[in-house]
Amino acid sequence: YDRFRTDVDWRDQIAATIKFLKRLAPIARDLGIHMNIETHEEITSFETVQVVEAVGPEVMGITFDTANVLQRAEHPIWAARRVAPYVRQSHIKDAGLGYEGPHVRYQMRPCGMGVIDFGELVEILHRANPDLHLSIEIDQSRDEMPLGKYPSVMEITDASWLAGHPDLTKEELEAYVELVQAYQKLIDG
């Protein structure tokens, strides 16, 4: 993940992205088009909001991937509330979360079979944008991806991992851990 590269700081990458998108913004305005940034595996919902607000919500929005935020130890409902005013597209996905030692393992699940409360999440998105289209994204297993496997483990007990997520509050992390614990009970039977 770019977030944990050592040759370039993550904050510098975000700043460079904002600078580039600001250069594109006047062109987008002139053409009447809209750009989106996705809540992808390596970027937090806090950072996507930062990008949108810096570039301008009239030309920049968010593609909200409901499961990707879990890989940044964000609670999906909390993230939905953050991004809802800026969501222009969606990737509706679900995932299960369970413990792997002291860390959390992320695994794709069919919608409704993971940790996400879609009733509440969709309501939040609908209140912000009643015309939003919800697109279900079908994910493939990590083993089948062209680039091979990459870790889907969140090291939520590691101080350096947490330091890489400065916007994540103790309260949200605790709510996230509750999701993990509840799903782990399902795994354990």
Cite the ranges covered by each PLM segment.
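Histidine-acidic metal/acid-base catalytic patches
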Residues: 45-59, 70-189
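A cross-family glycoside hydrolase active-site/sugar-binding cleft signature
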Residues: 1, 36-38, 63-65, 91-93, ...
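Active-site acidic/histidine proton-transfer and metal-coordination neighborhood
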Residues: 1-61
